[in-house]
């Protein structure tokens, strides 16, 4: 079947083929970092896939082999969030996290290269993850004056354990694909040249199963962490307040100035 471009998006590519849709974050010039428009386009693509009864599985990926996504574009971050094209502050990635989490069809992350910061959290929100051998995963928030105290930390702790989640967040270390596999952040590690074909095979295997059974199973598996949705909303507000603080701004400025942040004056 011919691959069909559904929308004329700017920041993403969206294709449908053989009951599978793929949403590709396409900002390779910034390692697929997202801005508010990027997130709005991804959300629109998810809505389209949800309403299209011919689609049974969604794949989320990044353009090229250098990066899946490195989180929010720090160059457009303000004191209260990320600036959209109308000059408004936004943290709409939190809405995207909820959409992926509750999406009635399986969502597969196809990770090549860097998946760090908010990009790693998007990977984590997907139901399953296939990573290529060159994948690098980790968190970066505390280095740049940011954090995710919702799904990004609470759900992470549920997946990889409290100690390991604290390690990721407190140190901002980065981990290769095999280390991420051992932690439980990815399900499979494959050669980079096999990544696309493996993702299609996995999606096809899922399509051969009962869609209603899988939908119910996803809801049941999510139920264990349902309380985290309220925590995520509260955490979103606290993140915006933190961006306004001197400490949050120091991390952001240090990133833009390509220097190490000096958080020593904020120790108490």
Curated annotation (Swiss-Prot):
Taxonomic superkingdom: Eukaryota
Metal-binding as UniProt keyword: no
Positions annotated to bind hydrogencarbonate: 139-141
Entry keywords, A to Z: Chloroplast, Lyase, Menaquinone biosynthesis, Plastid
Main location: plastid
Cofactor: hydrogencarbonate
Site (Important for catalysis): 148, 243
One Pfam entry name: ECH_1
Enzyme class: lyase
Pathway the protein acts in: Quinol/quinone metabolism; 1,4-dihydroxy-2-naphthoate biosynthesis; 1,4-dihydroxy-2-naphthoate from chorismate: step 6/7; Quinol/quinone metabolism; menaquinone biosynthesis
InterPro entries reported for this sequence: ClpP/crotonase-like_dom_sf (IPR029045), DHNA-CoA_synthase_MenB (IPR010198), Enoyl-CoA_hyd/isom_CS (IPR018376), Enoyl-CoA_hydra/iso (IPR001753), Enoyl-CoA_hydra_C (IPR014748)
Bound cofactor: record note: The hydrogencarbonate anion plays the same catalytic role (proton acceptor) as the side-chain carboxylate group of the essential 'Asp-185' found in actinobacteria, archaea, bacteroidetes, and deltaproteobacteria.
Residues the record lists as binding substrate: 30-31, 70-74, 114-118, 140, 146
The reaction(s) this protein catalyses: 2-succinylbenzoyl-CoA + H(+) = 1,4-dihydroxy-2-naphthoyl-CoA + H2O
E.C. number(s) listed in UniProt: 4.1.3.36
Signal peptide (from-to): none
Keyword Lyase: yes
Localization terms from the record: Plastid, Chloroplast
GO terms under biological process: menaquinone biosynthetic process
Record CDD domains: crotonase-like
Function: Converts o-succinylbenzoyl-CoA (OSB-CoA) to 1,4-dihydroxy-2-naphthoyl-CoA (DHNA-CoA).
NCBIfam families (alphabetical): menB, PRK07396.1
Family: Belongs to the enoyl-CoA hydratase/isomerase family. MenB subfamily.
Full protein name: 1,4-dihydroxy-2-naphthoyl-CoA synthase
Species annotation: Cyanidium caldarium (Red alga)
Biological classification of the source: Eukaryota, Rhodophyta, Bangiophyceae, Cyanidiales, Cyanidiaceae
């Amino acid at each position: 079947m011919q691959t069909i471009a559904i929308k004329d998006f700017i920041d993403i590519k969206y294709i449908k083929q053989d009951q599978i849709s793929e949403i590709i974050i396409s900002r390779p010039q910034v390692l697929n970092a997202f801005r508010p428009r990027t997130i709005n386009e991804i959300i629109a693509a998810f809505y389209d896939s949800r309403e299209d009864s011919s689609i049974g599985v969604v794949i989320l990926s990044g353009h090229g082999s250098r990066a899946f996504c490195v989180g929010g574009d720090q160059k457009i971050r303000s004191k209260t969030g990320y600036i959209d094209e109308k000059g408004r502050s936004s943290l709409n990635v939190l809405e995207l996290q909820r959409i992926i989490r509750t999406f009635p069809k399986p969502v597969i992350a196809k990770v090549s290269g860097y998946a760090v910061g908010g990009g790693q959290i998007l990977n984590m929100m997907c139901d399953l993850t296939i990573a290529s051998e060159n994948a690098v995963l980790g968190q970066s928030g505390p280095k740049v004056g940011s954090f995710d105290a919702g799904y990004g930390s609470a759900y992470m702790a549920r997946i990889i354990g409290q100690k390991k989640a604290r390690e990721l967040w407190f140190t901002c270390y980065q981990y290769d694909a095999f280390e991420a596999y051992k932690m439980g952040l990815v399900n499979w590690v494959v050669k980079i040249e096999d990544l696309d074909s493996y993702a299609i095979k996995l999606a096809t295997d899922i399509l051969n199963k009962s869609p209603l059974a899988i939908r119910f199973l996803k809801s049941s598996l999510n139920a264990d962490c349902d309380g985290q949705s309220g925590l995520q909303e509260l955490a979103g507000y606290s993140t915006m307040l933190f961006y306004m603080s001197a400490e949050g701004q120091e991390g952001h400025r240090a990133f833009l100035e390509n220097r190490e942040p000096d958080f020593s004056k904020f120790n108490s």
